[in-house]
Amino acid sequence: ADKTLYGPTLDRVIDTYGKVPRDTTDDGGYASIANMEYAKSKGVVNVVFNKIVGSLKNQVSSLSMETRLKKWRSGIEANISNIKRGFNLKRCNWKGWANFQAKVLWSIIAYNIRVMTGLIVARL
C-alpha cells in the first residue's frame, strides 16, 4: 500500500519547495520499479530504497553516494526512535489537532535542547 503513496509525496515535495530533490532515500515499503522510474522521470538523480525488491537496483551516481544516503537515513531513523522513546511520542492522548501539534513541537524542542546540551557537556 505504501508504494502508491510515493508519487504523490514526491509531487508534494516538489510543489512545496519548487525544486526537484537531487537525492531521495526511502523505506523499503516504497521500493518498486514504477516508483524508481517515476523519480527518474521527475529528475531525481540518486534514488535509494532501504530494502531492495526483486531485480530492482538503487540508482546512484556512485557507490559512495549510496552509502552516504543509507547512513543519513539510518541517522534520521535513530533520531525518530530517540524522540519516540525519550519523549513518549509513541501515542499522543492530547485531544484535538492543535494539542497534538503542541505535543510534537515541544517534544522536538526538548529533544534538540537535550542534544545541544550533550554536545556542550562533551566539549568540557
Where are these regions (language model features)?
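Basic, amphipathic alpha-helical segments enriched in Lys/Arg and hydrophobic/aromatic residues
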Residues: 66-124
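An internal, acidic/charged active-site-proximal segment
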Residues: 14-71
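Active-site beta-loop-alpha junctions of metal-dependent nucleic acid enzymes
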Residues: 1-17
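Short, conserved catalytic/metal-binding motifs centered on acidic residues
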Residues: 6, 21-31, 46, 76-83, ...
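Residue-identity detector for glycine
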Residues: 7, 18, 28-29, 43, ...
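Short glycine-/small-residue-rich flexible loop motifs, especially phosphate/cofactor-binding loops
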Residues: 11, 36, 81
